[in-house]
């Protein structure tokens, strides 16, 4: 993925966010974590938002509507957790849909922006562990009352992932694409 393509996606999604939610995006800063899916922190006229683009090569939501339904259900659950007081980002629905789709078929979700950095394993203090336990308890209590998923939205496929990784690595090596090679090293 070249930068121009990502900038084009960000601009198209920003326009769609304005139409769907009435939120004007002033700036989109890419977040360089993860694999294929592009994420941005978008500064808006209201508050910063987190936007996740569901890459068609990874999720194929346009071919598998059941995947979209399952992912939307997990986003709905996350939003319910947020509304019940569990500390997690809220998700912006539009007409009860949690994954939005632009006119050209870009699929994305809009979430509240939450500042912070993950703590390294083993580095939480006693107060942080206590708070984590409280919110974990709230989460489990709320989820007991929620309609469960029919099946997980995503099933890990280690062999498939490794095949895809090797294919991408070989293509990047042949092309001398250092950006993709760096993504591969991090994945």
Where does each model-flagged region fall?
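Juxta-kinase regulatory segment immediately upstream of eukaryotic protein kinase catalytic domains
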Residues: 1-28
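Short, N-terminal intrinsically disordered low-complexity segments that are rich in Pro/Gly
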Residues: 2-7, 29-32, 60-67
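Short N-terminal amphipathic alpha-helix/helix-capping patch enriched in small hydrophobics
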Residues: 13, 35-38, 74
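ATP-binding glycine-rich phosphate-binding loop
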Residues: 23-43
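Proline- and acidic/polar-enriched loop/turn elements at helix boundaries
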Residues: 30, 93-94, 151-152
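Short secondary-structure capping/turn micro-motifs that flank functional sites
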Residues: 34, 97-98, 155-156
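ATP-binding pocket architecture of kinase catalytic cores
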Residues: 44-148
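A cross-family kinase active-site recognition segment
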Residues: 122-186
